[in-house]
Amino acid sequence: AYGRKGPRASWPGYDYLMQAEAGFLSLTGDPDGPPARFGLSMVDFMTGVGLAYALVAGLISARSTGIGQDLDISLFDVALSNMNYLAAWYLNEGEVQRRLPRSAHPSLTPCQLYRTKDGWIFIMCNKEKFWPALCDALNKPEWKEDGKYNNFQGRLTHRDQLTELIDHALSNRPTEDWLKIFAGTVPAAPVNDL
């Protein structure tokens, strides 16, 4: 779990522990609730993929050099390496990522869960071109020109107000209807279970 060498080499370790220690739990869940783990054993999955990459690289090297390799991968190393984007953000700008309501993106809005008549939909306007498309689909063309919402920074500054407005606009139809309306123009997904 922690590699073959070092003071923790003999410690047992499991996915959920790695999620906690690497910082995943500090990013997941409602801001007013306790930290939460992923719903799946993502560190186990990512470690398996990392090992597969290492194995392929080792085979390619052995094929070209005639010499085999000793491969070593640990759950903790993989979990920590997956925090690279947030670590870079912290090291370069001092930004500490925190849990946000409705699984919102830290700097893009709208990019979170919204309520529909019968449940939830995740809308992800991660490019400016999607904002006018969303406004048109919601029959709210006036939002496109509103100075509070016509760019990412404005929408981020007014995220709470915009969340209420979008919730209200989506409240008159079920999720499936919205997916048909958004099809191909607004990135959106239903919240499904198994």
Describe the predicted segments one by one.
Residues 194:
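Residue-level "edge-of-site" marker
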